[in-house]
Amino acid sequence: LIAGSILAATAPAPVDGQEAEPGPRIAITIDDLPWNGPSPAEGRETATGRLLEALTARGVVATGFVRCAGIAPDASLLRLWVDYGMPLGNHSESHRDLNSAPLDVWLEDVRTCDARLRDVIDGPVRHFRYPMLHQGPTPERREAALEVLRELNYEIAHVSVDNSDFMLSRPYEAAVGAGDAVEARRIGRLLIDHIIAAVRHAQAVARRKVGRDVDHILLLHATLLVSDQIGALLDALAAEGFRFVPLEEALKDPVYRAPDGYTGRSGLSWLYRMEPASPEDANWDDAEAARIRKALHQ
């Protein structure tokens, strides 16, 4: 049996023996904390607070992944996340690329961030996300990195819904900075339409490879665009029938324990990596990125 046929028969178990509610589920994760991009006019703390308020108002527990080199100038932003009850994960100290950085330097980046995050949250850090989703270009390098991550007791925060939100972030910031509300609204709408399209694509890939809906994990970035649009995006996902679950709950889905079938330099969705690997599914991502580039220049 291939991994997909094994996993098809195994959906996540209901919590505490209760009957599971119908409908697909999704976890929200946000990378590059404390903040990615220039400070908005209102300040990063206000923008971060707006993001966290929108999540909390909808009962969403999102996990934020921290680039720890940014902690010193923006420690107050991480305290906001902790105060709102949002878990924090390790995204490394300097966002080094496992494809090209010396392995010892990359691992030290991970260990340094682990120590700094433990001080912030006053406890262990549970989840790690690879910078750029690069997990190692060779089996040897991938396994060497995994060995240290296991020693640190990390669970890998896989992504099932990757997307190009970062392509829209700087044009959005430029529109806001120029006072162009019409263009800012247009880019905000582009973001929501793009994420919904990416989610639908991920659902189709999961159903084809696993034979069922899976608990999805969405990757976003800590930007002004996401801060401003997260409420509308969550509402759009809810309109698609999604219920929101914490990352740790989504990762209980057996799909995230499937064998990794991909070795290479690309940063891929877990649905593309899992056996049988289907990196050709990333052609959709490339076409969607091209559509966004075209839309930005209209």
Predicted features and spans:
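Bacterial N-terminal signal peptides
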Residues: 1-9
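Boundary at the C-terminal end of the N-terminal hydrophobic targeting segment
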Residues: 8, 15-19
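Active-site beta->alpha N-cap acidic-glycine motif
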Residues: 19-133, 138, 218-219, 236, ...
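Alpha-helical scaffold elements lining the catalytic groove of polysaccharide deacetylases
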Residues: 40-41, 96-120, 138-152, 160-212, ...
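C-terminal domain-boundary segment and adjacent tail
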Residues: 56-62, 158, 224-298
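Glycine-enriched alpha-helix->loop->beta-strand junction motifs that scaffold or abut catalytic
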Residues: 84-88, 150-155
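Short, basic, helix/turn surface patches
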Residues: 90-97, 116-123, 181-200, 268-288, ...
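Conserved short secondary-structure transition element at the edge of the structured enzyme core
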Residues: 211-220
